[in-house]
Amino acid sequence: MAVGKNKRLTKGGKKGAKKKIVDPFSKKDWYDVKAPAMFNIRNLGKTLVTRTQGTRIASDGLKGRVFEVSLADLQNDEVAFRKFKLITEDVQGKNCLTNFHGMDLTRDKMCSMVKKWQTMIEAHVDVKTTDGYLLRLFCVGFTKKRTNQIRKTSYAQHQQVRQIRKKMMEIMTREVQTNDLKEVVNKLIPDSVGKDIEKACQSIYPLHDVYVRKVKMLKKPKFELGKLMELHGEGGTGTATKATGDDTGAKVERADGYEPPIQETV
């Protein structure tokens, strides 16, 4: 047998000695996720992030996180087929302040609307809000039987489909172009845009199940903390009450553990 160290044996003693198990959750912190003031329920839940260590700052790991929440949870409502995407834009103390990032219909709702003997009409348009957000809106609508109609099918002619699609694009452009993001979200919550399209298209062909089925965020303006604070109900004032999240429209405060962002230049 060759004389020398046995490299396979661990330094501490016996071969295969157990490693010290470290709980990964001991290095992590819980942060509250806060929805903007447009919604009734402000406290969405909690999110987990690794604690600040050296150059790795916890708040940097949280910024840009997207949360998908049902509108039923945001509005304390029974209508649960709309999902809103909210993105973390800033961290104040233990609160993640979010902003609107997109909207979608649930898959089961979309599947339940598609049926035989009717025409499905879809349209999409890219529109810029007054405060510089570029959104892509997708709309969907279905033809329905006229009153006293005996025929089983209710198919629209190609010319009618084109007219309805044009009307959809006009209304979506008008509703978004003349408003800022906050007002657009307030219109998306009850889907007043879909109802307007349904009314406007009655003269061309009667429609039902008209919805803005999806909203995509394409471009955002440069981030401004003041505007985000306004969305969360702080209205530009320096002092505000702490956001508990249990009540509706609560304000967010900079907590004691607030870490200012690191500046690249002094």
From Swiss-Prot:
Residues 234-266 are annotated as: Disordered. GO terms for biological process: ribosomal small subunit biogenesis; translation. Component of the small ribosomal subunit. The ribosome is a large ribonucleoprotein complex responsible for the synthesis of proteins in the cell. Part of the small subunit (SSU) processome, first precursor of the small eukaryotic ribosomal subunit. During the assembly of the SSU processome in the nucleolus, many ribosome biogenesis factors, an RNA chaperone and ribosomal proteins associate with the nascent pre-rRNA and work in concert to generate RNA folding, modifications, rearrangements and cleavage as well as targeted degradation of pre-ribosomal RNA by the RNA exosome. This is Small ribosomal subunit protein eS1. PANTHER family: 40S RIBOSOMAL PROTEIN S3A. Residues 244-257 have a biased composition (Basic and acidic residues). GO terms for cellular component: cytosolic small ribosomal subunit; nucleolus; small-subunit processome.
